[in-house]
Amino acid sequence: MLMVFWNSRPIFFLMCLIFFNSVYANEYETRVKQVDTMLQNDEYVLAADLDYHFSEQATEALKNGVPLFWNIKIKVKKRRNFWFDKTEEKHEIRYRLQYHALLKMYRVRNENTHIVSNFSTLTAALDGMATIRNLPVIQKSKLSPNALYLVDIKIDFEDSELPLPLQTQVILNSQWQLSSNWTQWTLSNETH
């Protein structure tokens, strides 16, 4: 009996470590708060509210001049019963967040449109990246009338853009897990 208990202690310790690590990781998790699509002029457009959470290590790296990058990935998929869903459209919005110590400003650059916005606080900069409005995702004419379509969205932190010494820390440290999970919803294919 004692031998069984002794052998299970490492497993118990490992389970506790995994549990506490996952609780700790969720504190910094980026997420999709709200998302919707609507039909405007024969085109479906997306509106989304995102929520970025920063760890102390990410904030420190940013303040030391390390730019941080995110890709917001959006997919429109046609549901198929006996095969994988077919991706009809893909979109990406790429943001670069950087702190300029000389100006004491946070700079957000949309890498797709090259639009740059300056903010005096990190919170304001993150809010600037957190709102998507009227993003065209698919033409109504590309949709089959009786098919079911799904839209997926994910915020992907690009840890490969970090300097090499930080990239090794990212693998082992939950404070650098700044991506979201996929969020999926049904695209209402309006017939009128």
Each model region followed by its residue ranges:
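Bacterial N-terminal signal peptides that target proteins for export
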Residues: 1-12
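Short, solvent-exposed beta-strand/turn "edge" segments of beta-rich domains on protein surfaces
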Residues: 36-46, 58-66, 82-86, 141-144
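Generic short beta-strand segments
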Residues: 49-55, 73-77, 155-158
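Cleaved targeting-peptide boundary
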Residues: 24-33
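N-terminal signal peptide c-region/cleavage motif recognized by signal peptidases
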Residues: 20-22
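A beta-strand/beta-hairpin structural motif
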Residues: 46-52, 99-101, 107, 111-114, ...
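Structured domain cores in non-transmembrane regions
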Residues: 58-125
